[in-house]
Amino acid sequence: MDAFNKEQKDKLQLKAVYELKPGGELPDVVLAEQRTLAGLKRHGSLKPVAFADGDRLPQKFRDADLSWYGVFYDPIVFLVNQQYARTVGQANICSWQDLAGKEQLRIALENLSDSNSTQNFLAGLADRFGEDESLEYLGSINRFIGQYSKFPFTPVRMAAVGDADVAITRQSYVFKYLENKFPAYVVYPKEGTPVNLFCVGLFKNTADDLQGLKVMEWLMTSEQVQAIAQENATGYLFLFPRGFDEAAADAEKIWLNSSYLEPVKQDGLTNKWLSKVRFSK
């Protein structure tokens, strides 16, 4: 926000609102995770808007009814303990199938029923492979998981200190720790990976569509936004990683939760994971 406000030189100023209070005044622009935007759309809170920059996004990264547009994403990655990698070879820890094919492996993973983020991971796999195949895969690595973690940073700590060989986690959880002497490193699964997609949209009550669009376009196209994200070690990756004038990221390797955005559908999938994987006999 500070960067945008300095650039505007008092012509248009942004103020952050981090929580929507019942009966409170709605902001003009919303930047949030895809499930939040999908919920706002279901409740009729967003205003469809078409603009040229939005049309450049691959279709899977924008709402079919023009209610929201993707900006950046937080991918699921492997955090691999350095000592373990030296034992088995880095070339043997590159894919989802590499994990399932191991005879011995200690995996650290957050409980997949605890949060929107973990449920998106579960849903992203199911959207990519189908429910049966994704649950079968998670069942195949379940034997490597001693206990599902309650807190998101626990898997990171376990991989770093050697209590786990591999952590399956969000890049945003680990990026700030990645220094030369950090005892673990990040792997992007070569097949692709589930992500949390962060999107931008206009609230229905916005007083000025053009000013709102200016903010949306800045988020999507400004190289300064990417630079700020990198400087602050957010771990977020942008849909136009080499700049808005270059090609978009490979959509085939970015797995979205597209079919489980409604709570009842997500809860159904989560309950299947609980019964068929975590607490299976």
Predicted regions and their residues:
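Short beta-strand->loop
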Residues: 64-71, 80-82, 87-89, 102-129, ...
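Early extracytoplasmic/lumenal segment of secretory-pathway proteins
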Residues: 1-39, 43
